Amino acid sequence: MTRGVEASERLIELVRRNDDIANHAAGCDAETVAAAENELGMAFPTSYRLLIKEFGTWDIAGEEFLGVYQTSAMGSKLLGSVAETLDARRRYGMPSDLIAVMFDGMGGLVVLDSSRVDQEGEYPVLVWNPGVADRQSMERLGDDFGSFAFALCQRAVTRWRESD
């Protein structure tokens, strides 16, 4: 098992243990995940795919992740990472090998860079701002989604609990 997948499994446990400050959808089946990857033109890294299958979309202690989900109002349209990635490509010229996974709160997107796959099949986590084409100037937040998301959520839960 990879480091990113182990971290994603720990994040699933963290969300389940803190259900009073977490929300999530029902999760995505294999067909929905495949449709999302097809629309984006690339596969999700394993650590992100695991969380999408488990939760679809989720938030915990104020940290919100796009994930992949559908609503009755929007029908079969895939929302979350799919809709936001396609919108950023169309409206802002986001490179086609990036996948949006969350908003950074300052006008940018936290993205997975599929052009830099590691030996475990994971993509690094970067911040992309509209208009930025140079990868070297993008802030790197982590080596894989699972480790990045678990660390972020663990800190958020600790801060939340300490403020009670």
Task: Describe each PLM feature range.
Residues 127-133, 137-149:
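Compact, glycine/acidic-enriched structural inserts
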Residues 1-109, 117, 159-164:
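A surface-exposed partner-binding patch
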Residues 143-164:
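Acidic, proline/glycine-rich low-complexity IDRs
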Residues 116-122:
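A short alpha->loop->secondary-structure connector
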